[in-house]
């Protein structure tokens, strides 16, 4: 139903603008000027009056739309901008970034005279006042996943790879259920850098200190990561031609930016290439779009890359240069960098999972140094620097004692400051003067089947378990 906008200046009737004034009645005959003179004078008067009237009407016509447009467009534009900024401010507040939310509202010109904006500012200030500092960042848990199974029929088809998938992977259905449980149990994603960071001391030195995480009472921070986000060829390419195909085992084949969003490429059982939420990153993004309060100030997961088969599904390691050719290799590097930039912009952290997926705790210091150098030269040079190392196989270079020795010296010189092993404890964090260590808890088929009690603070395995998973899960 159309309604009349009281702000709109009515337009003139087009017919009114073209109607000439009625001719005046002819005066009675009298002696004086000749009849022809009088007729000429009358016609001249009519012409002059008509011209004046037209000028007046045109002038009013020109002014009315301009005034009408300004009167209508300016408030509308202001309202649209206000609504957009207010929606973003509410999202920031939902993610516990109250200062940015307040700054967004007070950045709107004239906000003091808009009741809705005044109320929003007051609400954000009240929420900030109620937030409490998380008392002990060393009790923050860290959970991790491998590549998610998109098609259980292909992953669990009885081939030699089925056992490994059953042991070390979770399905998309299970991952979504885990997210829902974590959310319902008041966990909130934080970045690993939120646990602790460098702070300049009075003497000019730098020391890592516990971070200040402010959340509503009852909320609990948690770190999430994913290993091997390179999309191994053996999982997606059945004929060895370097391309994903229908003979793959039901996993995404790469991350990419499509229509401005991070998504996955996936080749289904019919050989059709699809794009969508087929692995952790887009699935987590989907969840956070519905539940922004599951993220602390925009934090998402840490994405760990194993370098020898590239990054994010792009074969950018030196071994692929000759195979791909210069042009295709350069394009792969460009695409990988685009994904890395998009991940960071979305709130993800990128980590090294080594170059060759070697057990850093067992190999020699020389071999570790060579592997780290390959990561730095072939992978980091493309996707950007990181200070986070997630040990392959969880194999740490030391026990609970402080780091020292050649291995640590190499990794520290290569820029790593956050080091994560794998541990079954609910949480394990060390904050040292120059670095941070954290234990990660694996969420996978093996842990869910044999040790569900180690996960019961996070979720109920019975409600998460995907019945498409074969049992028993093979023992390790």
Can you describe what each PLM-predicted range is?
Residues 1-33:
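N-terminal targeting leaders characterized by basic, low-complexity, disordered sequences
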Residues 29-46:
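N-terminal Sec-pathway targeting helices
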Residues 47-52:
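Alpha-helical transmembrane segments
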Residues 53-67:
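Hydrophobic single-pass membrane-insertion segments
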Residues 63-130:
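N-terminal, intrinsically disordered, polar/charged segments of Gram-positive cell-envelope systems
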Residues 85, 175, 335-336, 404:
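Amphipathic coiled-coil/heptad-repeat helices and related helical stalk/stem segments
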Residues 102-105, 110-111, 125-195, 204, ...:
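C-terminal active-site subregion of NodB/CE4 polysaccharide deacetylases
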Residues 138-158, 207-208, 216-222, 229-397, ...:
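Metal-dependent polysaccharide deacetylase catalytic core of the NodB/CE4 family, i.e.
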């Amino acid at each position: 139903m159309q309604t009349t906008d009281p702000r709109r200046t009515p337009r003139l009737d087009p017919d009114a603008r073209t109607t000439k004034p009625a001719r005046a009645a002819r005066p009675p005959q009298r002696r004086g000027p000749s009849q022809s003179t009088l007729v000429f004078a009358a016609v001249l008067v009519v012409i002059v009056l008509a011209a004046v009237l037209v000028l007046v009407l045109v002038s009013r016509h020109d002014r009315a739309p301009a005034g009408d447009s300004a009167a209508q467009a300016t408030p509308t534009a202001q309202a649209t901008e206000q609504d957009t900024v207010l929606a973003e401010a509410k999202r920031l507040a939902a993610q516990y970034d109250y200062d940015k939310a307040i700054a967004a509202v007070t950045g709107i010109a004239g906000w003091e005279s808009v009741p809705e904006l005044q109320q929003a500012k007051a609400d954000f200030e009240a929420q900030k006042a109620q937030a409490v500092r998380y008392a002990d960042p060393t009790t923050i848990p860290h959970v991790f996943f491998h590549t998610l199974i998109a098609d259980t029929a292909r992953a669990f088809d009885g081939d030699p790879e089925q056992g490994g998938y059953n042991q070390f992977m979770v399905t998309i259905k299970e991952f979504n259920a885990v997210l829902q449980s974590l959310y319902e149990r008041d966990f909130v994603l934080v970045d690993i850098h939120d646990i602790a960071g460098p702070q300049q001391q009075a003497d000019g030195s730098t020391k890592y200190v516990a971070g200040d995480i402010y959340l509503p009472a009852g909320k609990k921070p948690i770190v999430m990561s994913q290993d091997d986000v390179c999309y191994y060829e053996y999982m997606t390419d059945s004929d060895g031609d370097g391309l994903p195909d229908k003979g793959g085992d039901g996993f995404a084949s790469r991350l990419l930016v499509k229509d401005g969003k991070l998504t996955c490429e996936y080749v289904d059982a019919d050989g059709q290439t699809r794009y969508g939420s087929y692995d952790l990153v887009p699935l987590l993004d989907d969840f956070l779009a519905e539940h922004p309060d599951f993220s602390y100030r925009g934090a998402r997961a840490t994405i760990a890359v194993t370098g020898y088969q590239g990054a994010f599904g792009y074969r950018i390691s030196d071994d692929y240069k000759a195979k791909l050719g210069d042009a295709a290799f350069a394009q792969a590097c460009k695409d990988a960098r685009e994904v890395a930039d998009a991940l960071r912009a979305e709130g993800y952290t990128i980590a090294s999972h080594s170059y060759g997926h070697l057990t850093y705790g067992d190999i020699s210091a020389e071999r570790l140094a060579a592997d780290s150098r390959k990561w730095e030269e072939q992978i980091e040079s493309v996707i950007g620097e990181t200070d986070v190392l997630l040990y392959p196989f969880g194999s740490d270079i030391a026990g609970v004692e402080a780091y020292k020795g050649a291995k640590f010296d190499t990794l520290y010189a290569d820029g790593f400051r956050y080091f994560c092993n794998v541990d079954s404890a609910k949480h394990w964090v060390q904050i040292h003067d120059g670095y941070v260590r954290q234990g990660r808890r694996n969420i996978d088929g093996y842990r869910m089947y044999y040790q569900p009690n180690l996960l019961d603070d996070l979720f109920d395995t019975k409600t998460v378990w995907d019945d498409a998973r074969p049992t028993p899960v093979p023992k390790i």
